[in-house]
Amino acid sequence: YYSIWDWFNPLWPEKDQPTYRGKPCNEVTLNNYIEKVMYPQFKELVLKYEPALIFSDGDWWMDDEKWQTKPLLAWLFNNAPNKDEVVINDRWGKVRKKHGGYYTTEYGSGFSDPSILWEENRGIGKSFGYNRFEQFDDYNSTELLIYMLCDIVSRGGNFLLDIGPTADGRIPVVMQDRLINMGKWLNVNGEAIFGTRRWKRDCQWSEGVIVEYTKQEFHKGIPDPIIEMARYPRKGQARKEC
């Protein structure tokens, strides 16, 4: 995981960032940050650890031209020691679902196109980091998380499930419970998940309608699209679409 945006770096102060009171980004300090922090830090991580996968993040507010990620990725795929094996996602400056080794969705429903390599990313609750204000009901049940895993894998996707440790590194008990019970399920049923491939078309036992919600709707509490897909069909209306 590498965030190209560093909210608290003194070389790119908050008042110069594009999220500050609706003001345009200060490109002088941005370029200084990219040259002295982002580029050297990224290259140091690659040279020191030679990662097989890089999950970039923090690109939301600016495009790849302002982030200057094209030259950075050109270096990665032409000069880095891991250039022949490294895989990247699609978060490099407003290029999601356009460019990358694989595409990502976040608290979404993934993709149905079999030609796309993709991954659904989400937390066990509604937050990626530790959120002390989350209530027990904000966390998905083990049953629903297993359903999500099966649904995503059956459509050819990868499931990245995030946990949020506390400030001292502890994993909250409710998250431990979900991980342990998912592990128990996988110990029995793992052969149906690991090393499998998607079928030539999706299969559903319900209507299986994928609804795309806006970011604003999601933050206002609109139901999770995968949860909506998980509902059992009404009596007499089940059908198998294979």
Show which residues each predicted segment covers.
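Mature catalytic domains of secreted/periplasmic carbohydrate-active enzymes
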Residues: 1-242
